[in-house]
Regions:
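C-terminal helical "tail/cap" subdomain of flavin- and related membrane-associated enzymes
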Residues: 2-9, 80-83, 87-88, 323-324, ...
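Conserved N-terminal helical subregion
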Residues: 2-12, 29, 54-200, 251-267, ...
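Residues at the starts of beta-strands that form the adenosine-phosphate
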Residues: 11, 34, 241
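Conserved mid-domain beta->alpha element of the FAD-binding
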Residues: 14-32, 36-41, 163-164, 195, ...
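Acidic/histidine metal-binding catalytic segments
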Residues: 73-74, 132, 274-289, 349-358, ...
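Short Gly/Pro-enriched turn/cap motifs at secondary-structure boundaries
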Residues: 185-187, 220-224
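Short helix-loop capping/hinge motifs at secondary-structure junctions, enriched
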Residues: 202-209
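FAD/FMN-dependent oxidoreductases across multiple families
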Residues: 215-219, 226-231, 235-240, 246-323
Length: 429
């Protein structure tokens, strides 16, 4: 089917109301547009975990002027990244500040960030018509050329553009990559699993640790690194909550552990981290429950777009959490949609829309794919087998990841770098 040349309205259909989908809804709000977000769940329970937005994403969110929704969620500025070995000895402290990248690294309860994005997407106080979120609306596929999205109840909706933000098991991805070299690509186990723990800070006992090593009241991220295990932890919700992500070798690499909510016994976690400091196990021991999550990602796809459809977030480039860039890359995707589709309206032909989607992929693909690869590299064993020497360098990819001012600026910088390299090569010839 050919891409149609005319549409009566410029209707945005977003599949998925996670962080990527809601960010896209905010970014694409504009007079003369309608935005429909299709979400398969009832949205009555978001994951209980902490999440960070890196400076590259915080800068974008700041530009959306949604502080009225974020402020009440008690976000925290991450002041430092601290790296310890399993003996509890400080190896690296990396101070974080706004001046370095133009924005702070922000810490949130995931549910709070999700709720703030939902409020901004649907509020009458933001530019453009509010997005409409239709819950309990599972999507089975789409016709990328016509922009028709098919729902599990047998109905369909049509969009001038279709945004596939439906996560690591994306139905839209299956349609976009059909016929490409990536056809059939699915999420793959990475060999790692993560225990997720969230505790109320005021319920924690007094910890037997020097404040120079670890201060529960400090707004900072701490990583404790063993040979094949590590813990990443920090505060959230104004210090009311404290969260831990505890990475271990996947105990069931052939299993289907794709849920956030596979329960795990606390004793299992404490045993896995028995070589780690007693004070961190004291924090773990207060967990009301523990969830085990099998970590999966996807290999870089050969394309993110077909016809009127484009993939963003985990649907396009699911990555490991080892650099904390998953949500931030979703925010970057949303900003790219905003930048490249700024002039798209009811007069835009299908060919014109597709050309802009291709431009988005050109601006985003290499960067997101490289950050995927960096995240895999950061997941490799990061300490000697005796656990005493930490080999991880948290600053290794920081400049590349966080020195970012939007998709069009990034594309311009890349073109300039390529032109400079060409001139240098020509001069040596």
């Amino acid at each position: 089917m050919a891409i149609r040349s005319e549409v009566e309205h410029w209707d945005v259909v977003i599949v998925g109301a996670g962080i990527a989908g809601l960010a896209a809804a905010i970014a694409l709000r504009k007079d003369g547009r309608s935005i429909l977000v299709l979400e398969k769940s009832s949205m009555n329970k978001e994951v209980g975990a902490l999440i960070s937005l890196q400076p590259n994403a915080s800068k974008i969110v700041d530009g959306w002027n949604m502080q009225q929704f974020l402020a009440e969620k008690k976000p925290m500025v991450d002041e430092a990244f601290r790296l310890l070995n399993v003996e509890g000895k400080l190896q690296v402290e990396m101070k974080l500040n706004t001046s370095q990248f133009g924005a702070d690294r922000m810490l949130y309860h995931r549910q709070d960030l999700h709720d703030a994005l939902r409020q901004a997407a649907t509020s009458d106080d933001m530019p453009g018509s509010p997005a409409v979120i239709r819950t309990s609306s599972g999507v089975t596929g789409c016709d990328c050329e016509s922009g028709t999205v098919y729902l599990s109840n047998g109905s369909s909706v049509q969009g001038s553009v279709v945004i596939g933000a439906d996560g690591i098991r994306s139905a839209i991805r299956d349609e976009v990559i059909k016929g490409s070299a990536s056809e059939g690509s699915k999420a793959i186990p990475t060999g790692l699993s993560a225990y997720r723990i969230l505790v109320e800070t005021d319920k924690l006992p007094k910890l037997e640790v020097s404040e120079d090593v670890f201060d529960l009241k400090r707004s900072a991220t701490t990583m404790i690194v063993g040979h094949d295990k590590r813990i990443i932890m920090g505060p959230g919700r104004g210090g009311e909550m404290f969260g831990l992500v505890c990475l271990v070798p996947d105990p069931n690499p052939d299993g289907e552990g794709t849920s956030w909510n596979n329960p795990a016994p606390l004793e299992e976690v404490l045993e896995a981290f028995k070589a780690f400091p007693a004070w961190v196990r004291d924090i773990m021991s207060q967990a009301p429950d523990v969830a085990l999550w099998q970590l999966r990602d996807i290999d870089p796809l050969t394309t993110w777009t077909k016809g009127r459809a484009i993939l963003i977030g985990d649907a396009a480039h699911a990555m490991l959490p080892t650099q904390g860039q998953g949500a931030s890359q979703s925010i970057e995707d949303a900003e790219a949609l905003q930048a490249f589709l700024s002039d798209s309206d009811s007069k835009s032909s299908g060919d014109e829309v597709h050309a802009q989607l291709q431009a988005i992929v050109s601006a985003r693909y290499e960067r997101a794919s490289l950050i995927q690869a960096y995240s895999r590299l950061q997941a490799k064993p990061a300490a000697s087998k005796d656990n005493k020497t930490v080999q991880l360098n948290p600053q290794e990819f920081m400049e590349y990841n966080c020195n970012y001012s939007g998709a069009k600026d990034w594309a311009k910088r890349q073109r300039e770098a390529e032109e400079m390299a060409y001139k240098q090569t020509a001069a040596r010839a």
